[in-house]
Amino acid sequence: MGGKTFMLMAGGTGGHIFPALAVADSLRARGHHVIWLGSKDSMEERIVPQYDILLETLAIKGVRGNGIKRKLMLPFTLYQTVREAQQIIRKHRVECVIGFGGFVTFPGGLAAKLLGVPIVIHEQNAVAGLSNRHLSRWAKRVLYAFPKAFSHEGGLVGNPVRADISNLPVPAERFQGREGRLKILVVGGSLGADVLNKTVPQALALLPDNARPQMYHQSGRGKLGSLQADYDALGVQAECVEFITDMVSAYRDADLVICRAGALTIAELTAAGLGALLVPYPHAVDDHQTANARFMVQAEAGLLLPQTQLTAEKLAEILGGLNREKCLKWAENARTLALPHSADDVAEAAIACAA
């Protein structure tokens, strides 16, 4: 049985899980073995087994803002989950652990530290999460997607994204020959964003019919009917879907995206080369989505529109002032931020640490 065994630790959100899956693919393509440490009753428990990866789980949930009882139980829970993680590491003879963030990352990383197993961490956001901040003290390598997430030199690798997104043609090639209305993609994540679903149709209704962009709007789970009804009631044409299964084509065909500013979204926008109107989720931990958005805005790859300032009138004003030339410039600037070999860079760093 050749190859080394790596334990990936990631959970809670797609922003942690999908970059880790990209690294898992890279490790396996090099002949190594991968197991996954996640939380019980979690998103990763539903997603990871679909990729033919062995999933081990711990009974742990977050503690930030989750009540006094859970915080009082934390020392006992941490002791128990660290012991369980140690058993998992021993059972599978793990030679290196890679932490991507989420509640499960800390006990898994602490277990590795106590057993003398090398730790690599990868931070997806512009503001490092709590688990990764703690583990960075013990990590053999600290890798990150945004320049100021950590001060460790040589760790900037970007966020792993799917190769088919990175392999899209450059913006100038995609935009060539486009005429007529702008085509705008609206995505609020898999669950949708109610504020975008409400405000975007209202903003379009304020524009003259001949100035309205062509819209492709992902509603999010369970929200398609109400979104389509809002567009219809306002007399605005839009193509609405509950969930976009082919994001590669959606990115390829769009001139601009209206979206949140999660780490995975920013990574995909830069990999594809697409400008965006970014409306950060205001309740994200440490307001990391605003920091993520600033990364693109500082490169003149889009606009940051705080949710508190998002009104139909403001959005209509912005959309009315856009043209394809500006969208192309934003798209080209976004593409310059891409680090397309991120998954391989993380995998190679971990392999070196396990040597």
From Swiss-Prot:
Its EC number is 2.4.1.227. It is found in: Cell inner membrane. PANTHER family: GLYCOSYLTRANSFERASE, UDP-N-ACETYLGLUCOSAMINE--N-ACETYLMURAMYL-(PENTAPEPTIDE) PYROPHOSPHORYL-UNDECAPRENOL N-ACETYLGLUCOSAMINE TRANSFERASE 1. Keywords: Cell cycle, Cell division, Cell inner membrane, Cell membrane, Cell shape, Cell wall biogenesis/degradation, Glycosyltransferase, Membrane, Peptidoglycan synthesis, Transferase. It comes from the Bacteria. Gene3D superfamilies: Glycogen Phosphorylase B. This is UDP-N-acetylglucosamine--N-acetylmuramyl-(pentapeptide) pyrophosphoryl-undecaprenol N-acetylglucosamine transferase. The lineage of its organism: Bacteria, Pseudomonadati, Pseudomonadota, Betaproteobacteria, Neisseriales. It catalyses: di-trans,octa-cis-undecaprenyl diphospho-N-acetyl-alpha-D-muramoyl-L-alanyl-D-glutamyl-meso-2,6-diaminopimeloyl-D-alanyl-D-alanine + UDP-N-acetyl-alpha-D-glucosamine = di-trans,octa-cis-undecaprenyl diphospho-[N-acetyl-alpha-D-glucosaminyl-(1->4)]-N-acetyl-alpha-D-muramoyl-L-alanyl-D-glutamyl-meso-2,6-diaminopimeloyl-D-alanyl-D-alanine + UDP + H(+). Cell wall formation. Catalyzes the transfer of a GlcNAc subunit on undecaprenyl-pyrophosphoryl-MurNAc-pentapeptide (lipid intermediate I) to form undecaprenyl-pyrophosphoryl-MurNAc-(pentapeptide)GlcNAc (lipid intermediate II). It is an enzyme of class 2 (transferase). GO terms for cellular component: plasma membrane. It is a peripheral membrane protein.
